[in-house]
Amino acid sequence: MAENMTIATMAQPSESPSKSGEEAPASTNPAATSAPPRPPRVPYHQIYKLPAPIRTFPLPTFYPSNPLSLFHLAVAWLRQVLLPPPAEPSVIHEGIWDPDTRSVHVKDPKSIRALWEQGFYGKGSLSRSEPNWFKRELSRRGLDGTTVSEERTASRREERRQVKWERAKAELEAIEKQKHEEAKLNSETVNAAIPEPPAAEIEPEPEVLLSSLPDHVLSATSTIPLSRAAPTNEFVPKTVAHGHVEPKPPVGPLELLALPNSYALVRGEELALSQPEPAPTEENVRKELKAPVGPIELLALPNSLVDLVALSVVSVLSEDAGVDEDESSTEDQLEASALTNDEPETSATEANDSTSSSSPPHTDGLPDSQPTQENVPATPERRKSVRFSSTVESTTFQHTDAASEVKNNNGSSDVEVFSSFVSAVEKPVILNVEPTVISQELVDKEHFQLAPEEAFFLTFGLGALRVVDPVTEAPISNEQLLIKLRANSYFPPRSVDNLSPEDPFLVQYAVYHHFRSLGWVPRHGIKFGVDWIIYQRGPVFDHSEFGIMVVPSFSDPRWSEFEHEESKKTWSWLMGVNRVLSHVLKSLVLVYVDVPPPPVFDEEMKKGGIAAALKKFTIREVMVRRFSVNRNR
């Protein structure tokens, strides 16, 4: 395969040897000595020591200056010849082809960990990359004391967000303080520029003798200024003959910023000042709400819909209660006035058993000839007949009942009824059934997904994976799997007769196989708007440094005889992708894939199979850097 590499691989940083011989100083803190020691953590370079799901047995290094190294080399070679290790790959994992998701699913936990730890293949169906949903659920339920990478990432992001918020707050406070100091300095400068009147021009006020004033003036006067008040340092604007403030040209920054932006704003202010301001009402106050942007406002929000409904109902009930209290106070006053004018009652029984035929009482100061309302008592409550039942039953509050009454039949308020209703909704309904033991066993519901390129590389390139049919459970050969993956790279899937060398799967797999062969770890880069992102060692050790965009190229002149789809990329697309990658500290690499024409590809497939056909794809990399005047001089 003809390849032109323009990307210089970065040298891996040499790991400094650990100073195991040096002992740590003894801790004098008693809390540190009493805390239980943590279990030793396995280093990452031991967990992910295999770059591929196969094992290699290299021979020891031979040093010509050391004769013993030759003996070591001979012993290792004889051991591998006489007692050869098992053929690699010794473990073949099994995956199931899923046509719905167009991926290969792996469900064996051992195979999942092996494929992830030995090359970073695939991703968890319920996770971002590493399949740790089960550990995350254990940590969330408190069944395991360990933490997962997602929780640590979330905590770091929260710390960064809090630091940014504190920094912005400090900057805003500094700006406000600077504005206040500038305004104070500006006012002092203006006041100092105003000349004070000379002392000779100030006419002294005549002295007033209190003894010379009449008595009625002394009694009406509380205090009399005996001297002229000292001039204040506050700014006093000059006035002209008409009594208006003398306008000054806006020369300072504060005056320029205070000017209106257009005549419409000036006209609007004049209209607003001319119209009387309406009195604030409760509805207007309620409408003046601000968006909760601070941490205190966010914490003040209700936690659930039940709390929100409770707050609204309580506010409505409080308003109704206030209105009813006013009405009840008026009724109490009327009842008190009626009781003072009525005759004294003999007993409560006579008052309750009185009928409508009794004569109404006469009010004082009104003649008998004045028409009065008959059969209407002074207080409606005195006309009611109260009877108690021998059986007392609790009142049932239905969900559809309106919460407009302040008092219920049992004497409880609507607020108490609604609070009991909310507590009943939040509490689980306890039925009269036998208690059953709920199993606390957590089932792992996550499976492992392999992309088509990853699955075919493990199957064809390494031979460490066997893909089976989901219906017949029969193994799928490499040729059949290639045809299936090529057909499903289109939507909807194409038939076998309509396939060509420019299939998206062939182009993408050529790039994936190319970078895997060079030792990189390519993974899908849809998150960053690119086709692939490549890691030097893996996502556990470092961040990806490059983003890959695959561009098919039809440079062979024989492509003019066949229909093919040219890539339609614009400069705006290129600048947009480059800007996105620059924000995440990645470099854009355009990978041009020279696709062979159909006759050449079909001929190589018949002669040498898949390997011979893939050799006809040529890879060319072009690094794209954003031009900067300061950096590219």
Swiss-Prot record:
<comment type="function">
    <text>Constitutes one of the two catalytic subunit of the tRNA-splicing endonuclease complex, a complex responsible for identification and cleavage of the splice sites in pre-tRNA. It cleaves pre-tRNA at the 5'- and 3'-splice sites to release the intron. The products are an intron and two tRNA half-molecules bearing 2',3'-cyclic phosphate and 5'-OH termini. There are no conserved sequences at the splice sites, but the intron is invariably located at the same site in the gene, placing the splice sites an invariant distance from the constant structural features of the tRNA body.</text>
</comment>
<comment type="similarity">
    <text>Belongs to the tRNA-intron endonuclease family.</text>
</comment>
<dbReference type="GO" id="GO:0000213">
    <property type="term" value="F:tRNA-intron endonuclease activity"/>
</dbReference>
<dbReference type="GO" id="GO:0003676">
    <property type="term" value="F:nucleic acid binding"/>
</dbReference>
<dbReference type="GO" id="GO:0005737">
    <property type="term" value="C:cytoplasm"/>
</dbReference>
<dbReference type="InterPro" id="IPR036167">
    <property type="entry name" value="tRNA_intron_Endo_cat-like_sf"/>
</dbReference>
<feature type="active site">
    <location>
        <position position="543"/>
    </location>
</feature>
<dbReference type="Pfam" id="PF01974">
    <property type="entry name" value="tRNA_int_endo"/>
</dbReference>
<feature type="compositionally biased region" description="Polar residues">
    <location>
        <begin position="1"/>
        <end position="19"/>
    </location>
</feature>
<keyword id="KW-0819">tRNA processing</keyword>
<keyword id="KW-0456">Lyase</keyword>
<dbReference type="InterPro" id="IPR006676">
    <property type="entry name" value="tRNA_splic"/>
</dbReference>
<feature type="compositionally biased region" description="Acidic residues">
    <location>
        <begin position="321"/>
        <end position="334"/>
    </location>
</feature>
<feature type="compositionally biased region" description="Low complexity">
    <location>
        <begin position="346"/>
        <end position="364"/>
    </location>
</feature>
<feature type="compositionally biased region" description="Polar residues">
    <location>
        <begin position="387"/>
        <end position="410"/>
    </location>
</feature>
<feature type="compositionally biased region" description="Low complexity">
    <location>
        <begin position="24"/>
        <end position="35"/>
    </location>
</feature>
<dbReference type="GO" id="GO:0016829">
    <property type="term" value="F:lyase activity"/>
</dbReference>
<feature type="region of interest" description="Disordered">
    <location>
        <begin position="320"/>
        <end position="410"/>
    </location>
</feature>
<protein>
    <recommendedName>
        <fullName>Probable tRNA-splicing endonuclease subunit tsp-2</fullName>
        <ecNumber>4.6.1.16</ecNumber>
    </recommendedName>
</protein>
<dbReference type="InterPro" id="IPR011856">
    <property type="entry name" value="tRNA_endonuc-like_dom_sf"/>
</dbReference>
<dbReference type="GO" id="GO:0000379">
    <property type="term" value="P:tRNA-type intron splice site recognition and cleavage"/>
</dbReference>
<dbReference type="InterPro" id="IPR006677">
    <property type="entry name" value="tRNA_intron_Endonuc_cat-like"/>
</dbReference>
<dbReference type="GO" id="GO:0008033">
    <property type="term" value="P:tRNA processing"/>
</dbReference>
<comment type="subunit">
    <text>tRNA splicing endonuclease is a heterotetramer composed of tsp-2/sen2, tsp-1/sen15, tsp-4/sen34 and tsp-5/sen54. Interacts directly with tsp-5/sen54.</text>
</comment>
<feature type="active site">
    <location>
        <position position="535"/>
    </location>
</feature>
<feature type="active site">
    <location>
        <position position="586"/>
    </location>
</feature>
<dbReference type="GO" id="GO:0000214">
    <property type="term" value="C:tRNA-intron endonuclease complex"/>
</dbReference>
<feature type="region of interest" description="Disordered">
    <location>
        <begin position="1"/>
        <end position="42"/>
    </location>
</feature>
